[in-house]
Amino acid sequence: MRYGTFMILTAGLMALAPPAQAENRSAYVTLMLQAFAAKVQCPGTEVVYQDLVQKAQDMQQADGTTESARKAIAWLLTGGKMGEKGDDTLMGEVALAMQTTDLDQKRLGMQTWCDTQKTKLAGFIRSKS
């Protein structure tokens, strides 16, 4: 009797538990934007694209998130000349990431920001060989 009650309670709790959720896509988009900003703003830096793809998988992002975010970032940074416009939510996430990154760069100064990114984004950016 106790075993049956335990099983029913366990099954009920499992049914009520929220499903595992992917980490916030906005956090991933910000990470990507910072990696690409470091490539452009910090001399001798390049992006390790495959590691960004792996990070998306680790964060349980939907397939294609890295590529759609890359295209949206390019589209916004080039005024629509490169990349592709993403859905409104993605474009909002990219715009917010751009604003926060810009504020960080101004607050810290570019050299300090670059030095910080080398540590913060280790694995996603590296020095050019």
Residue ranges and their predicted role:
Residues 22-51:
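Immediate post-signal-peptide N-terminus of mature secreted/exported proteins
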Residues 16-22:
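Sec/Tat signal peptide C-region and signal peptidase I cleavage site
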Residues 1-5:
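Positively charged n-region of N-terminal signal peptides that target proteins for export
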Residues 16, 36, 107-108:
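Processing junctions and N-termini across compartments
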Residues 6-15:
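Bacterial N-terminal signal peptides
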Residues 54-129:
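Compact alpha-helical subdomains of small soluble proteins
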